[in-house]
């Protein structure tokens, strides 16, 4: 932009001193054209260096159907808060299996940053054993939890391994605890489910350490009931906070 500003000043000087020799005017015109080409190349270079962020996962990102018509989804918040380019591959309802089967193959090769938020639906499919009325020891419950999380762990690590094959920055989002206390379906296991959420997040942090990628802790972002559109989906407010966290990360890496 500085070069464009200089070009404008050059033109002003040319108009003010129009009585200069023709040869000087021609040299000034040639210099102006050169500076114009330089400024154009600079603008094109800036566009090439623009962040291109791919968003993978589930409804934590693909939350458009859960916000009001006048409200913004996570992707819309991202686009409103920055000039970066965003490619949403995340799909409401998807699991780690779906990311492996449907999302990875669609990754743009030009992605400079990748954000992954997955695992919540996998967890929802497994926590119903906590509703079991049979009496189990703490040891038995923990053993069941570990067994149920094992295949999720394997798939999650495979996803991150595949993401790491491309030369780009990676951000893994943890799974938040949700607003389960206000939901009749989950209220009776709201506290017990936090243990499984913590176990899944341990997998995420461990995977991040293995592949040397970053983590965004969603439990520090979704902190109030207003952050949720329902017990488990981000609201307009929560989505805005998530978008801010993602943009801060893009700027920092």
Predicted regions and their residues:
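Alpha-helical cap/lid subdomain in secreted, periplasmic
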Residues: 104-236, 240-253
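Intrinsic-disorder-associated, low-complexity terminal segments enriched in Asp/Asn/His/Tyr and depleted
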Residues: 19, 26, 34, 46-49
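Serine-esterase "nucleophile elbow" of acetyl-processing enzymes
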Residues: 43-94, 104-110
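Short, solvent-exposed loop/turn segments at secondary-structure boundaries
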Residues: 65-69, 99-101, 228-231
């Amino acid at each position: 932009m500085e070069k464009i500003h200089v070009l404008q000043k050059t033109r002003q000087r040319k108009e003010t001193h129009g009585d200069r020799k023709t040869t000087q005017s021609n040299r000034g015109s040639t210099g102006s054209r050169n500076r114009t080409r330089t400024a154009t190349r600079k603008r094109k270079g800036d566009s090439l260096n623009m962040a291109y962020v791919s968003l993978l996962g589930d409804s934590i990102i693909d939350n458009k159907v859960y916000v009001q018509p006048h409200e913004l989804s996570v992707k819309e918040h991202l686009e409103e808060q920055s000039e970066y380019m965003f490619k949403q591959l995340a799909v409401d309802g998807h699991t780690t299996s779906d990311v492996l089967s449907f999302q990875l193959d669609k990754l743009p090769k030009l992605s400079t940053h990748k954000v992954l938020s997955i695992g919540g639906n996998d967890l929802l499919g497994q926590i119903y054993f906590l509703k079991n009325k049979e009496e189990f020891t703490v040891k038995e419950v923990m053993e069941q939890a570990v067994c149920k999380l094992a295949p999720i762990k394997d798939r999650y690590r495979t996803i991150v391994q595949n993401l790491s094959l491309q030369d780009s920055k990676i951000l893994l989002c943890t799974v938040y605890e949700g607003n389960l206390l206000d939901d009749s379906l989950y209220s009776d296991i709201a506290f017990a489910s936090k243990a499984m959420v913590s176990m899944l997040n341990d997998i995420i942090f461990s995977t991040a350490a293995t592949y040397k990628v970053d983590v965004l802790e969603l439990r520090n972002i979704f902190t109030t009931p207003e952050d949720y559109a329902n017990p488990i989906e981000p609201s307009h407010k929560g989505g805005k906070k998530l978008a801010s966290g993602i943009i801060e990360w893009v700027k920092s890496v």
